[in-house]
Amino acid sequence: METIELLKKMISIPSFCGNEERVADLMVATWVEHGYSAERSGNNVWVKSRNFDPVKPTILLDAHLDTVRPNGNWEKDPFTAVVEDGKLYGLGSNDTGGSVVAMMAAFLQLAEKKQAYNLVCLESAEEENTGKNGIQRIVGNLGKIDLALIGEPTGMQAAIAEKGLMVVDCVAKGKSGHAARNEGLNAIYEAISDIEWFRSYRFGKESPLLGKVKMTVTGIEAGTLHNVVPAECRFMVDIRVNEYYTNSDIYETIRRNVKSEVRPRSFSLNSSAI
């Protein structure tokens, strides 16, 4: 397999979360070129070793196809792969196109020989936004998995633990009024104290593997007119949780300490480790 050329093709295809169809097509075509009939559900693509034996343990090789959107700081065309000083630049080259092509190459090397295990190679979708049409859509189709190797940019160091993720949407309430008069209650000012709490609060238990719980306010929205005191201020918080807390624990602490309404998007992505 020409891994570098395949990675260049992947980079040339925009594959933002939920829009991985064309790069998934490329994956299917690549497997066909190498003699494998890929299975597909949505934009998730996978193959199994030919002599699959359900009695043997099964190893999953997985990396995701989707990327985030490029920000404004790119100095190169994010969709044109460029090799400089032995490094390949392009959107998704590191997270995780490089892992995709490496996993595929490893599968082809190993699956052609008799092994004491089965192999499944998966190119998954919607990882960056934990979308419902990603790996959770198809994990039941893969059969029993005894060990999974997940491709992520970890500096070539094996990662054995992962922080949990909880995103919360917060709404600070005020009262509308005219900005020219001493009217209303400014919801932005009400939100400020809660935002400061998220910035400064420290959870007591620090993990030797995963470090501290980290809370980051990543978006804020309020007001539509310059002369109207806003009645609502909405902000969202990205929370990364170590193994000493569940997402429910974190939520209860937040709820006790802030005045804003707090709505978790999900409690399901707790920290995990092996």
Describe every region a protein language model picked out.
Residues K56-V120:
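Active-site metal-coordination/substrate-binding segment of hydrolases
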Residues N71, A159-L165, V228-P230:
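Short glycine/proline-enriched loop/turn "hinge" motifs that connect secondary-structure elements
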Residues M1-D62, D66-P70, E232-M236, I250-T253:
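N-terminal helical capping/dimerization or prosegment-like subdomains
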Residues A38, A81-V83, V217-I220:
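A structural signal for short hydrophobic beta-strand segments in well-ordered beta-sheet cores
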Residues M1, D169-I274:
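Metal-dependent amide/peptide-bond hydrolase catalytic core
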Residues L65, P153, A179:
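Active-site metal-binding loops of divalent metal-dependent hydrolases
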Residues T96-V167, V171:
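Acidic/histidine-rich catalytic neighborhood of metal-dependent amide-processing enzymes
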